[in-house]
Amino acid sequence: MKLALRVAYDGTAFYGFQRQPGVRTVEGELIRALTKLRIIENPEENDFKGASRTDRGVSAFFNVVSFVPGERADLAKPEVLNHHLRDVWVLGVAEVPDEFHPRFWARGKTYRYYLVDEGFDLETMLECAKLFEGTHDFSAFAKLEPGRDPVRTISSIVMTQRGGYYVVEISGESFLWEMVRRIVNALRFCGLGLLEVGEVKSMLEGIYTKKIPPAPAEGLVLWHIDYPGIEFTGDGRGIKKARRDLFERYSRALTRAALFGDALLEL
């Protein structure tokens, strides 16, 4: 038997998803809780795998890990695990085939970036967004790793205005390192008049002298991963702690935003 967990986390509390010596990571926090509860003995023996290795500061509402459970498989449920985790919440569990791999079985991902409105020209940003849709070489909009194919397919980019900020939702089959954050910054630069739409088109055609830098990691969240035929289930008890923790973070952030907003008005 193999289990998969749907997990959410506050990326600002970690040095990224992947385990690293001497720093706190999402993967490390999950493995700590799973081994403490004797759900697994160690990540290698129990075939622990993750779907997306998000960078430091990047959050997730839907990431997935899988493992072969040990003697206490009965404890691998949200209502138990969430009492042993900090800044990470298990939102669902699914029994999956033995050959399941959370990275390679994913059929698509959706990211959301939360972008404060700086007086953008929305029409220009939407024109720029359309250029990214489809299949392109994204070398100019990624931090390339040796041997990785820079060609990717973006199925859609949707921008939604909510009060004083925009939600930029980007969906595709797979993404390169920092690709979403660099696309968002390209949209931002176009919206501010710092970059021409024609320049973005040229960059996608391989004509450029410098790359677009990534937008800050804190605005990005891995929103959804598509696994056809797999359903993650959890009950109200398991979600209760996640909801309470998220509301506390929301309340603190809103208080700080109000404080700094009033300070700006006085300057």
Tell what function each PLM region has:
Residues 1-267:
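Structured-RNA-binding interfaces characteristic of tRNA pseudouridine synthases
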